[in-house]
A protein has these predicted regions:
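Acidic/His- and Gly-rich active-site-bordering loop/insert found
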Residues: 1-108
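Active-site alpha-helical elements of protease catalytic centers
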Residues: 107-122
């Protein structure tokens, strides 16, 4: 597991991109998120959804604070669509390379970068 390193969203985004979480396979992305959020004091539950004839799909439910009063929900997904023909990529789609100040990789904008922002803002 990669440590949070003060919640740096760049570090978190790169760590999530490096998980080859092509639908429906998780490749450790959910566990990585659970680890980070647990370190921050969240109670985390990893839920396994099963349906006959399909691959299992993991989901994460994380909660902090008491159950009284208003709640704020961050919702997202860690899976990405297949990268297609890798020869058409200028870099490894799961290497999370930083080029000219931009992070390049599967899920950088949909939606691993946003999830890293949720976590770092918490």
């Amino acid at each position: 597991m990669i440590n949070i390193e003060n919640g740096d969203p760049i570090v978190l985004t790169k760590a999530l991109i490096s998980c080859r979480s092509v639908t429906p396979h998780n490749d450790g992305a959910i566990e990585q998120l659970s680890h980070w959020l647990s370190e921050m004091g969240f109670k985390c539950d990893i839920l396994n959804f099963k349906e006959d004839g399909t691959d299992d799909v993991l989901n994460l439910w994380a909660r902090i604070g008491n159950e009284e009063g208003p709640a704020l929900c961050f919702a997202g997904h860690t899976d990405v669509v297949p990268e297609g023909d890798e020869t058409r990529w200028s870099t490894d789609p799961f290497a999370a390379n930083e080029i000219d100040g931009k992070i390049i990789g599967r899920g950088a904008t949909d939606m691993k970068g946003a999830i890293a922002s949720f976590v770092s803002a918490t």
